[in-house]
């Protein structure tokens, strides 16, 4: 248990992505006393509709200091540390995405329209914009939040910073928002072993395959593959149940990872009739789809 606690206490940088042959990239961590565990009893689940986010560049950009861009009314402009703290508090448990930018940054101007479009389509996410060169107050806020390069994106939940990125492309921003803010998709969110057992028990009949996406909060490959998981959860809802769990969410989740002998993430567990039939480790879209089809009973040739 000490090993698990030590892992949970480590910063983001300790989860090291690395390439793996034939399975794209994963993040690794090590447990003691690995043992396979058949667990489980059955399968299936309810579904909800997920509306895919379609991003297109608009005319909006951060613009000159003090000049808010058009058509971005859903992005809150922050002018001081006090306003920033109030916005985080008012968001409660919603995901907050804060962009720290400057008026002279070409990269900030390039990516801002995509954040504006996300703000229009992701109603359960709060978007903030801080122009670091607007005033002494915004400069002080950037120093407080340790912003060194722009554009810098920080992600918060319940006033706690859970993730941050800098210099990212629009597709990665969209992936991060989906990964950290996804609350209403057809992918069932699991928060511990009891949730896993409940999911399997609730879906005792129906013959569906359960695909359990096991990852970590701070895992680039996990974020990368998640939009694919969302799309598959819609297109395969008649035959496959999708669920996910972040191993570092709490001790129950981490113990589940240990019992399932998960040592790299993302790992996808394929469960049918209460037993783990197989697994796929990696973030390759084609390989994941192929494995899901194979465990669904579709003949796949490589």
UniProtKB/Swiss-Prot annotation:
Induction remark: By drought stress and photooxidative conditions.
Keywords carried by this UniProt record: Chloroplast, Disulfide bond, Electron transport, Plastid, Redox-active center, Transit peptide, Transport
One function term, GO molecular function aspect: oxidoreductase activity, acting on a sulfur group of donors, disulfide as acceptor
Gene3D superfamilies (alphabetical): Glutaredoxin
Intrachain disulfide bonds: 219-222
UniProt record similarity statement: Belongs to the thioredoxin family.
Function (record text): Probable thiol-disulfide oxidoreductase involved in resistance to oxidative stress. May participate in the reduction of alkyl hydroperoxides derived from oxidative stress by acting as a physiological electron donor to the BAS1 peroxiredoxin. May regenerate methionine sulfoxide reductase B1 (MSRB1) activity through sulfenic acid reduction.
Protein name: Thioredoxin-like protein CDSP32, chloroplastic
Natural source organism: Arabidopsis thaliana
């Amino acid at each position: 248990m000490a090993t698990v606690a030590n892992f949970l206490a480590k910063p983001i940088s300790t989860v090291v992505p690395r390439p793996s042959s034939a399975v794209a990239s994963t993040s690794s961590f090590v447990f003691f006393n690995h043992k396979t565990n058949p667990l489980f009893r059955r399968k299936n689940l309810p579904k909800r509709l997920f509306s895919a986010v379609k991003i297109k560049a608009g005319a909006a950009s951060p613009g000159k200091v003090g000049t808010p861009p058009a058509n971005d009314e859903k992005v809150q402009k922050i002018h001081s540390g006090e306003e920033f703290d109030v916005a985080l508090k008012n968001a409660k448990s919603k995901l907050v995405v804060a962009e720290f930018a400057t008026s002279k940054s070409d990269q900030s101007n390039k990516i801002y329209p995509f954040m504006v479009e996300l703000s229009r389509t992701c109603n359960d996410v709060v978007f903030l914009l801080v122009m670091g060169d607007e005033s002494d107050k915004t400069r002080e806020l950037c120093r407080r939040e340790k912003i060194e390069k722009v554009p810098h994106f920080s992600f918060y939940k319940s006033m706690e910073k859970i993730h941050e990125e800098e210099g990212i492309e629009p597709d990665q921003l969209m992936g991060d928002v989906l990964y950290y803010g996804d609350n209403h998709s057809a992918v069932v969110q699991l928060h511990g072993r009891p949730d896993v057992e409940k999911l399997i028990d609730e879906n005792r009949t129906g013959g569906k395959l359960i695909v359990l996406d096991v990852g970590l909060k701070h895992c680039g490959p996990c974020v990368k593959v998640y939009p694919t998981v969302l799309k598959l959860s819609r297109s395969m809802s008649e035959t496959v149940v999708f669920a996910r769990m972040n191993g570092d969410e709490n001790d129950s989740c981490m113990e589940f990872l240990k019992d399932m002998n998960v040592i790299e993430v993302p790992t996808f567990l394929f469960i049918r009739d209460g037993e783990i039939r197989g697994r796929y480790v990696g973030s390759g879209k084609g390989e994941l789809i192929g494995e899901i089809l194979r465990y669904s009973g579709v003949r796949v040739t490589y």
